[in-house]
Amino acid sequence: MTGTVSTAVGCAVGIPVGVGVIVACLFWIRMQRRLKEEDIIDQELNRAVYDESGFVSFNNIDTLKAEPNGHPSSEDTNEVMHSSDIDDNGDDDDEDHNARRNNTYAAQDKNNGKYVPAYRRQINKHNSILQQQRKSRNLVNTMGHSIESLSMDDHSQANGKSRQVSVYDQMVPVLDDANRDSSSPFPTNDKDTSDKKSNLFQSHDVSANTSTSFFETRSNDNLIKNLNSHDFGSYYPRRPSTSNLNHSQGSLHTRNSSMLSLGKIENAENVFATPKSENILKHPHPLEHESSSISNETNNVTDNTIDGESASKSSKTYQLKNNYDIQNTSEIAEEDQYENEFTNYSENKRAYIDGLRPKM
């Protein structure tokens, strides 16, 4: 029984563990194969990038220029191909080697696994034909360009240990000049180019100076307009007003930050304050300023009412009717500005409450 139990436990535990290990090993082997394939693809990509044999050579940009007569004929092509096998000068070895390499590149790609598009093969073929045709027509230009290419090759070989130069490093944009002759690919006269550059810099400096002076004048004009249009501190009336608004006494001190309006606040009358008997007597209602005689009579009446108790009855000036004595201003902090003889809320409330009481 003991052996049977141990066998059953071992099978129940060992079989799933073994299956898991086998599956993990299979996945690991598959991942390693995928990584190896990716490494091979990366190596081929690097070789394709840094191998200039499969791309257009940008050392001689004249080779990309199309001839005015169009593509060369087949007879000229055959003659050029035949003449390319003969080395007339030792300086043309590099170009001959490049031409033969470009001619045989399309044939070699059939055996290689790397795919080359049709347009790339056509460009390489056309490039080799143009190089050979240009060499056969003008040996002097060919020698000059070969010297330049040799110097660039020597320079690349000298720096090859530090950094490997790719064909994409040679892709320098060339901008067309509108002033040059259309027949020549580049301006041949150095003096003309220097004169053009100097004229360009001079015009740039003149335009910069003009623009800066223009912006300075515009900024000064805008500053003057803003200063003239701004209203510095003229928020309060220049002469006292007779209108009574519902503002507290501290509303005049809300603009203490305005330095220009401080002088006006000290001298100006607080027109928003609670009307008192003295102010009312000094400033009667505007309706009674119809004539000078009425104003004189009002002043005389107010002078007489200050001494007697019948000042409010004899005076015809308009006064606010409050819930308290208007003379007792020291004990009362606030009042209702809209409470007058027609809207006496406290009196109306008192009358309403008295009306609710039972009559005896």
Curated annotation (Swiss-Prot):
GO CC term, one of those recorded: cellular bud membrane
Check the UniProt entry and state the signal peptide residues, or none. Answer: none
Any idea where this protein resides? Cell membrane; Bud membrane
Stretches in topological domain Extracellular: 1-8
Enumerate composition-biased segments (Acidic residues): 86-96
Species lineage: Eukaryota, Fungi, Dikarya, Ascomycota, Saccharomycotina
Give a short account of what the protein does.
Answer: Plays a role in cell wall integrity. Affects the cell wall polymer composition in the growing region of the cell.
Q: Where is the composition biased (Polar residues)?
A: 101-110, 292-316
Give me the segments passing through the membrane. Answer: 9-29
Q: Which residues lie in Basic and acidic residues bias regions?
A: 189-198
- Membership in a protein family: Belongs to the SKG1 family.
* Membrane topology qualifier: Single-pass type III membrane protein
What GO biological process terms are annotated to this protein in UniProt? Answer: cell wall organization
- Side Cytoplasmic, residues: 30-360
Keywords from UniProt, A to Z, are: Cell membrane, Cell wall biogenesis/degradation, Membrane, Signal-anchor, Transmembrane, Transmembrane helix
Locate the region Disordered.
63-114, 176-204, 284-316
What is the protein's name according to its record? Answer: Suppressor of lethality of KEX2 GAS1 double null mutant protein 1
